[in-house]
Amino acid sequence: MEFSVKSGSPEKQRSACIVVGVFEPRRLSPIAEQLDKISDGYISALLRRGELEGKPGQTLLLHHVPNVLSERILLIGCGKERELDERQYKQVIQKTINTLNDTGSMEAVCFLTELHVKGRNNYWKVRQAVETAKETLYSFDQLKTNKSEPRRPLRKMVFNVPTRRELTSGERAIQHGLAIAAGIKAAKDLGNMPPNICNAAYLASQARQLADSYSKNVITRVIGEQQMKELGMHSYLAVGQGSQNESLMSVIEYKGNASEDARPIVLVGKGLTFDSGGISIKPSEGMDEMKYDMCGAAAVYGVMRMVAELQLPINVIGVLAGCENMPGGRAYRPGDVLTTMSGQTVEVLNTDAEGRLVLCDVLTYVERFEPEAVIDVATLTGACVIALGHHITGLMANHNPLAHELIAASEQSGDRAWRLPLGDEYQEQLESNFADMANIGGRPGGAITAGCFLSRFTRKYNWAHLDIAGTAWRSGKAKGATGRPVALLAQFLLNRAGFNGEE
């Protein structure tokens, strides 16, 4: 679908459809009032007759309104004006896209971007409208033989801004929104792929294709098991021992700043393409969803795609830590003691706490890049789901300014995170009688002790950890990957690149 931005009054728009808002109780938005005035009260008369209350999600499609050049006007209920927040704004946009498609509109001029959303400017409203529209239209049917094509006639959406001064920021918002939406789609597509297709080799092939598409300043290196062995990544290797699929670590390097002192930001994604739990095997119910255990790597891939598409003037490295945790005659066992790349030893008490065993070696590996900051993204703990549910990502960090940056980016993007502590008292739960540490610390504070485990391998740089176990995918009827936290990390990198969304 094509997006553009313009500035103009509604009475001068000649389009298939104009979209305007109506508030509760039957209150016209300023743009709707203009249309009502030129139509001699036609719209307000309909509202007085009870055709539309203005409640969230209500719609009313008007045809051939007197004195209006456009063929149709779509009235969208926006709820109470003072209560219109970010979440409700996105829901209104989603309802708009679905209604326009259902009613056969091929193009529309949308004035909803002129609604007042507290604390949000036109750049934010246009960008969120683009991202929400693309999210609404997303489907994953690549593997279906009988594809039922949904009715999607909508081809063009024009967002209106109040004055010509906002056109530049509106165009930038569309550019950024499309790049972020493409990154989210890429992450969702990877996450939704079945594990018999999407293994570590598949992740590596996608990373190579990304480098081919942006060969100007993106290179990809794939590190196999033999090289990992030479590097001393025994913890990472142990996790994949039970699988017939080779563990592969894909390193994507984007160079947007040629300055010698421009240190990179490193993103590390957990890429367990299937997690059976290993010898500590998971229950069969819901095990199919363990294909989503690579959503951290999928998100990093999506972010790298966004960065390359926008050619941000920063250096970013993305690492996809591909692996598969399976039971078998060669699988690692509870009771094993592993020597990590850092030299520290780990006693394995549970083979289903494997993500941290992969990540700890990758976090040591990335020291060679002398990073500005390292952020790992992982579907790491069920404990984080218990703590924060399915709406907010868990954040831990060893550097307060980095944590504050990520929280700010989460608020800007609407892809929210909440910081959890990393106190020394939690480290005591990882004590082992036979190694430097155990790979689990018991049930209390499980998300935090997992973060504490990782923190032992991040002492040489500023680091943050995003636990997306509760936010990376949805279960039930709407089962599927969400693409989070691509939007959060994209905003973080946009801020680092100087695009903070201010007009």
UniProtKB/Swiss-Prot annotation:
<dbReference type="InterPro" id="IPR043472">
    <property type="entry name" value="Macro_dom-like"/>
</dbReference>
<feature type="binding site">
    <location>
        <position position="275"/>
    </location>
    <ligand>
        <name>Mn(2+) 2</name>
    </ligand>
</feature>
<keyword id="KW-0645">Protease</keyword>
<dbReference type="GO" id="GO:0006276">
    <property type="term" value="P:plasmid maintenance"/>
</dbReference>
<comment type="similarity">
    <text>Belongs to the peptidase M17 family.</text>
</comment>
<feature type="active site">
    <location>
        <position position="356"/>
    </location>
</feature>
<dbReference type="GO" id="GO:0004177">
    <property type="term" value="F:aminopeptidase activity"/>
</dbReference>
<dbReference type="GO" id="GO:0006508">
    <property type="term" value="P:proteolysis"/>
</dbReference>
<feature type="binding site">
    <location>
        <position position="293"/>
    </location>
    <ligand>
        <name>Mn(2+) 2</name>
    </ligand>
</feature>
<dbReference type="GO" id="GO:0001073">
    <property type="term" value="F:transcription antitermination factor activity, DNA binding"/>
</dbReference>
<feature type="binding site">
    <location>
        <position position="352"/>
    </location>
    <ligand>
        <name>Mn(2+) 1</name>
    </ligand>
</feature>
<dbReference type="GO" id="GO:0030145">
    <property type="term" value="F:manganese ion binding"/>
</dbReference>
<comment type="function">
    <text>Probably involved in the processing and regular turnover of intracellular proteins. Catalyzes the removal of unsubstituted N-terminal amino acids from various peptides. Required for plasmid ColE1 site-specific recombination but not in its aminopeptidase activity. Could act as a structural component of the putative nucleoprotein complex in which the Xer recombination reaction takes place.</text>
</comment>
<dbReference type="InterPro" id="IPR000819">
    <property type="entry name" value="Peptidase_M17_C"/>
</dbReference>
<comment type="subunit">
    <text>Homohexamer.</text>
</comment>
<dbReference type="Pfam" id="PF00883">
    <property type="entry name" value="Peptidase_M17"/>
</dbReference>
<keyword id="KW-0378">Hydrolase</keyword>
<feature type="binding site">
    <location>
        <position position="354"/>
    </location>
    <ligand>
        <name>Mn(2+) 1</name>
    </ligand>
</feature>
<feature type="binding site">
    <location>
        <position position="354"/>
    </location>
    <ligand>
        <name>Mn(2+) 2</name>
    </ligand>
</feature>
<keyword id="KW-0031">Aminopeptidase</keyword>
<dbReference type="InterPro" id="IPR011356">
    <property type="entry name" value="Leucine_aapep/pepB"/>
</dbReference>
<feature type="binding site">
    <location>
        <position position="270"/>
    </location>
    <ligand>
        <name>Mn(2+) 2</name>
    </ligand>
</feature>
<dbReference type="InterPro" id="IPR008283">
    <property type="entry name" value="Peptidase_M17_N"/>
</dbReference>
<protein>
    <recommendedName>
        <fullName>Cytosol aminopeptidase</fullName>
        <ecNumber>3.4.11.1</ecNumber>
        <ecNumber>3.4.11.10</ecNumber>
    </recommendedName>
</protein>
<dbReference type="GO" id="GO:0005737">
    <property type="term" value="C:cytoplasm"/>
</dbReference>
<dbReference type="GO" id="GO:0042150">
    <property type="term" value="P:plasmid recombination"/>
</dbReference>
<dbReference type="GO" id="GO:0003677">
    <property type="term" value="F:DNA binding"/>
</dbReference>
<keyword id="KW-0464">Manganese</keyword>
<feature type="binding site">
    <location>
        <position position="275"/>
    </location>
    <ligand>
        <name>Mn(2+) 1</name>
    </ligand>
</feature>
<feature type="active site">
    <location>
        <position position="282"/>
    </location>
</feature>
<dbReference type="Pfam" id="PF02789">
    <property type="entry name" value="Peptidase_M17_N"/>
</dbReference>
<dbReference type="GO" id="GO:0006351">
    <property type="term" value="P:DNA-templated transcription"/>
</dbReference>
<dbReference type="GO" id="GO:0070006">
    <property type="term" value="F:metalloaminopeptidase activity"/>
</dbReference>
<dbReference type="InterPro" id="IPR023042">
    <property type="entry name" value="Peptidase_M17_leu_NH2_pept"/>
</dbReference>
<dbReference type="GO" id="GO:0043171">
    <property type="term" value="P:peptide catabolic process"/>
</dbReference>
<keyword id="KW-0479">Metal-binding</keyword>
